[in-house]
């Protein structure tokens, strides 16, 4: 299924004029965020492996194409199957909402974004739900930029400062 999760360093982000962030967990959607038509986007596994030394990674997915578990097998993350957006929000709460960064693109990610300390909406090849953009803290063109922001968190300072 998935590899054992190792201890993480976390990400500290000092945001001038706003609340500082102390992130330990990434909760990320699969369909349309990490994948296209149920297949992982090129380069995503390597980025997730790199990021796993900094954040614990949980993939929460309705698994529209029924390929998530197979596609993510062997990566240092946990896969959680969900039926609705409220279940994603409950996972945020389980992880400790004040320490969670959420990444997604769909309508069923809205509650997850509202519960998380930081929400990054991904436009990507499948687009993004308009309602999600209204609750996102940051909007990026694709998952690669989202993961790069977490690998280089100082880049978030300018976007999030008050």
Question: Where would I find each of the regions flagged by the language model?
Answer:
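C-terminal cap/substrate-recognition subdomain and adjoining C-terminal extension
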Residues: 56, 63-162
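Non-catalytic pre-domain segments flanking phosphatase-related domains
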Residues: 1-28, 162
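Short amphipathic alpha-helical segments, especially helix-boundary/capping motifs
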Residues: 6-8, 21-25, 42-46, 65-68, ...
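Asp-based phosphoryl-transfer active-site loop
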Residues: 19-38, 113
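Weak global preference for isoleucine
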Residues: 11-15, 28, 49, 57, ...
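Short, acidic loop-to-helix structural element flanking the phosphoryl-transfer center
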Residues: 14-15, 20, 37-55
């Amino acid at each position: 299924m998935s590899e054992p999760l190792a201890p993480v360093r976390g990400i500290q982000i000092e945001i001038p004029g706003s609340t500082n962030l102390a992130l330990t967990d990434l909760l990320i959607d699969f369909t349309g965020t990490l994948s296209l038509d149920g297949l992982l986007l090129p380069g995503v596994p390597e980025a997730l492996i790199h990021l796993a030394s900094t954040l614990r990674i949980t993939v929460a997915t309705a698994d529209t194409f029924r390929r998530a578990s197979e596609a993510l097998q062997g990566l240092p993350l946990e896969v959680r199957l969900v039926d609705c957006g409220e279940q994603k929000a409950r996972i945020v709460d389980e992880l400790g909402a004040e320490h969670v960064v959420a990444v997604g693109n769909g309508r069923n990610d809205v509650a997850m974004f509202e519960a998380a300390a930081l929400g990054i909406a991904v436009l990507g090849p499948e687009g993004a739900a308009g309602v999600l953009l209204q609750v996102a803290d940051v909007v990026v063109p694709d998952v690669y930029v989202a993961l790069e922001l977490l690998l280089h968190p100082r880049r978030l300072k300018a976007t999030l400062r008050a």
